[in-house]
From Swiss-Prot:
Recorded name of the encoding gene: kdpC2
Protein name per Swiss-Prot or TrEMBL: Potassium-transporting ATPase KdpC subunit 2
Hydrolase is among the record's keywords: no
Transmembrane segments annotated in the record for this chain: 13-33
Gene Ontology cellular component annotations, sorted alphabetically: plasma membrane
Lineage: Bacteria, Bacillati, Cyanobacteriota, Cyanophyceae, Nostocales
Subunit structure and binding partners: The system is composed of three essential subunits: KdpA, KdpB and KdpC.
Source species: Nostoc sp. (strain PCC 7120 / SAG 25.82 / UTEX 2576)
Length: 199
């Protein structure tokens, strides 16, 4: 009888923990997230002026046009193109510093930047650990400033104001380095172009 009572107690405890961890806790987090942080809880999706989603401010994407600031290189190629990994995968290349494939990729990135008259700095030739980092350093943004200003036909000072506006500071004021969110910056520049054309 004692053995059966212990089994029933174990089943009850298992059901209680299942109820708490599989239903109550996730629902509580869902309610708190949607109530206090609705934008972040739904992926921080940015929409254009027509209401069409253009990306997430948390996940980088490829920008190839001269009039856009370019993101960091991605080992997963942002799930785009022939060599891309499927959507949902993130991570670095895990190539050793002695691997010729890594050196070849870095040289290719550096040459492409030189063709654009951009000084190849670390942010612009090395991929981030996740391969999806939405930020570049302020220095990397300033390196691309002249190219973007020339392609958009505006003064570099105008672009510099936008860079400063979309620079996120250090986390809690002490952790990490300031970074520029590439999607937010590029979209703000597009909006400036639209406003300029309407005036």
């Amino acid at each position: 009888m004692s053995f059966i009572r212990e089994i029933l107690r174990a089943i009850r405890i298992t059901l209680i923990f299942w109820l708490v961890t599989a239903i109550i806790y996730p629902l509580a987090i869902l309610v708190v997230g949607q109530g206090l942080f609705p934008i972040q809880a739904n992926g921080s999706i940015m929409e254009n002026i027509e209401g069409t989603p253009i990306g997430s401010t948390l996940i980088s994407q490829v920008f190839t046009s001269e009039k856009y600031f370019h993101s960091r290189p991605s080992a997963v190629r942002y799930s785009q193109g022939r060599k891309a990994k499927p959507t949902g995968i993130s991570g670095g290349s895990n190539l050793a510093p002695s691997n010729p494939a890594l050196l070849e990729r870095i040289i290719e990135e550096a040459n492409q930047l030189r063709d654009e008259n951009v000084q190849p700095i670390a942010d612009l030739i090395y991929s981030s650990g996740s391969g999806l980092d939405p930020h570049i350093s302020v220095q990397a943004a300033r390196q691309q400033l002249e190219r973007v200003a020339r392609a958009r036909g505006v003064q570099p000072d105008e672009i510099l104001l936008a860079i400063n506006k979309f620079t996120d500071g250090r986390f809690l004021g002490i952790f990490g380095e300031p970074g520029v969110n590439v999607l937010r910056l590029n979209y703000a520049l597009d909006l400036q172009d639209i406003n300029r054309q309407q005036n």
